[in-house]
Curated annotation (Swiss-Prot):
GO terms for biological process: post-transcriptional regulation of gene expression. PANTHER family: RNA CHAPERONE PROQ. Residues 111-167 are annotated as: Disordered. The keyword Chaperone applies. Keywords: Chaperone, Cytoplasm, RNA-binding. SUPFAM superfamilies: FinO-like (SSF48657). One of its GO terms (cellular component) is cytosol. Disulfide bonds: none annotated. It comes from Sodalis glossinidius (strain morsitans). This is RNA chaperone ProQ.
C-alpha cells in the first residue's frame, strides 16, 4: 500500500489492521482471540508500511485486547487465530478466567465513574441554584401612625476563636474480605475520591456494595477501604 496517510490514533490503526487482516482483526462486533506472540508476526508483515510504527502497533494491540468486545470473545472452547485466520490452539482456562476478571473490573470502573459524575452533577446543581429570599410584606401606610424611632445599634459579640480542624481519619485498604460484615460502612476507591458505600453481600467473586446514590455493584477487595 503506497502513499498511505500517516495513522494518528489507535482507532485508525485497528481499522487498518482489520482491512489488512480481515480474518484476524475486526473493527466492530465480537473479536476473535489472537495467537500468542502475534505482535512479532504483525511487525514482520507490516514492516514495509511507512504509515505505522512498532510503537503504534503495540499501543493499538494493547487497546484491542483490553476492549470489552475482545474480552467477551475469550470463552472456553474458543480457538486463537493467526493473522490469516488459521486456528492456533484452544484457549486455556487460566486465560479465560483472567479475561473474565478484567471484564468485571472494567465494568466496575465504568459504574464508579458514572456514580461519581452523577454525584458531581448533583453538587453543581445545588450550588448553582441558591434559595431565593422570602418576599417580605410591605408596610401599610397610614397618616395616623407615628413614625417609629430608630432602634439603637447593638454591639455584636466578638466572634469565638476558630477551633482547629479535626484530623482526617486515615483509611486502610481491605486485604481480606472475610474481615467484612453485612451492613458495614465502607469506602470504594474511585480515583482520588473514595465514595461511601455499605456492604450488602460477600461472595467469592467480590463484595456487593450499595453506594450512597443507591447504585449496587460488585467490587473486588483491592477497590475497598475501611
Amino acid at each position: 500500500m503506497e502513499n498511505q496517510p500517516k495513522l494518528n490514533s489507535n482507532k485508525e490503526v485497528i481499522a487498518f489492521l482489520a482491512e489488512l487482516f480481515p480474518l484476524c482483526f475486526t473493527a466492530e462486533g465480537e473479536a476473535r482471540p489472537l495467537k500468542i506472540g502475534i505482535f512479532q508476526d504483525l511487525v514482520e508483515r507490516v514492516q514495509g508500511e511507512e504509515n505505522i510504527s512498532k510503537t503504534q502497533l503495540r499501543s493499538a494491540l494493547r487497546l484491542y485486547t483490553s476492549s470489552w468486545r475482545y474480552l467477551y470473545g475469550i470463552k472456553l472452547g474458543a480457538q486463537r487465530v493467526d493473522l490469516d485466520g488459521h486456528p492456533c490452539g484452544e484457549l486455556e482456562g487460566q486465560h479465560v478466567e483472567h479475561a473474565r476478571k478484567q471484564l468485571e473490573e472494567a465494568k466496575v470502573r465504568v459504574q464508579l465513574q458514572r456514580a461519581a459524575q452523577q454525584a458531581k452533577k448533583r453538587e453543581n446543581g445545588e450550588a448553582a441554584s441558591p434559595r431565593r429570599p422570602a418576599a417580605g410584606k410591605r408596610p401599610i401606610k397610614s397618616d395616623n401612625v407615628m413614625p417609629s424611632k430608630p432602634r439603637p445599634k447593638q454591639e455584636r459579640p466578638a466572634p469565638a476563636p476558630r477551633q482547629a480542624a479535626a484530623p482526617v481519619a486515615k483509611t486502610v485498604s481491605v486485604t481480606d474480605i472475610s474481615m467484612l460484615q453485612i451492613g458495614q460502612a465502607i469506602k470504594v476507591k474511585v480515583g482520588k475520591n473514595p465514595m461511601d458505600a455499605t456492604v450488602m453481600e460477600i461472595a467469592k467473586e467480590g463484595v456487593r456494595v450499595q453506594l450512597s446514590s443507591g447504585m449496587a455493584l460488585i467490587v473486588r477487595a483491592e477497590h475497598l477501604q475501611f
